[in-house]
């Protein structure tokens, strides 16, 4: 079920090395002198944003489909956090450094990066802490190495991604100033204790001539189950 979208992602990786597309999809890092993926470049100018748009257009025309989760769609969230480094450092001085290091690593390695946003809905009339304790993602322990988390998230493309930026979509913690459910972190998708439960794919169930996009560009949704997963500081 993963082959269609994995083939597309592989094609995007290959395009960056081909003379016909390399100029639109890569840039030379001013510090290291290395050629990196332009989609993950930290934007600082109008020209940076226009270059990203040109790269997206180039990819979409080549692969012949609108694919939204091919590894860089959540990079913008990292850039927003980078802009708020001073605020993050007020919470914990390590957080600002973590964001800067993550942006650098993703840009250099062209990491397949997705989000882990959507929560199992459960009973929406209740606060997170009043529901099934193992359903919504939350911290169960804090150690010198990091936090241990348990619960679930839904995310498209997680099963074939390198990592996910996991964060809450619920903002009501009741009277609590701090909540074990208010979590944001980067997690490798092969972390110990993390399980992937995927829906079936659309490819092969219908005539490709009648349903060309679902056969060629199906992005698989996954239920991520965190079973006491350690998230390092």
Identify the residue ranges that each predicted region occupies.
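N-terminal-proximal low-complexity accessory segments that begin disordered
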Residues: 1-20
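Internal helix-loop-helix
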Residues: 17-113, 158
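FAD-binding core of flavoproteins
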Residues: 120, 124-233
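Alpha-helix initiation and N-capping motif
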Residues: 6, 75, 96-100, 133, ...
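Arginine residue identity/basic-tract feature
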Residues: 9-11, 53, 69, 94, ...
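Terminal targeting/low-complexity segments that flank the catalytic cores of oxidoreductases
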Residues: 4-10, 32, 36, 223
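Gly/Pro-rich turn-and-neighbor structural signature
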Residues: 82-150
């Amino acid at each position: 079920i993963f082959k269609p979208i994995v083939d597309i992602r592989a094609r995007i990786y290959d395009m960056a090395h081909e003379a016909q597309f390399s100029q639109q999809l890569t840039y030379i890092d001013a510090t290291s002198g290395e050629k990196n993926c332009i989609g993950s470049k930290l934007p600082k100018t109008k020209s940076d944003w226009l270059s990203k748009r040109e790269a997206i257009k180039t990819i979409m025309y080549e692969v012949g489909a609108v694919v939204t989760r091919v590894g860089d769609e959540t990079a913008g969230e990292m850039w927003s956090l980078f802009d708020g480094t001073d605020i993050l450092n007020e919470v914990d001085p390590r957080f600002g450094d973590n964001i800067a290091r993550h942006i650098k690593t993703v840009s250099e390695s062209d990491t397949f990066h997705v989000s882990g946003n959507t929560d199992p809905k459960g009973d929406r009339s209740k606060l997170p802490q009043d529901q099934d304790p193992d359903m919504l993602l939350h911290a169960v322990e804090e150690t010198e190495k990091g936090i241990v988390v348990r619960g679930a998230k839904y995310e498209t493309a997680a099963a074939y991604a390198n990592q996910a930026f996991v964060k809450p979509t619920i903002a009501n913690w009741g009277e609590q100033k701090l909540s074990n459910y208010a979590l944001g972190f980067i997690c490798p998708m092969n972390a110990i204790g993390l399980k992937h439960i995927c829906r079936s794919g659309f490819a092969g169930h219908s005539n490709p001539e009648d349903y060309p996009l679902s056969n060629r560009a199906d992005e698989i949704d996954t239920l991520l189950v965190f079973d006491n997963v350690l998230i390092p500081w």
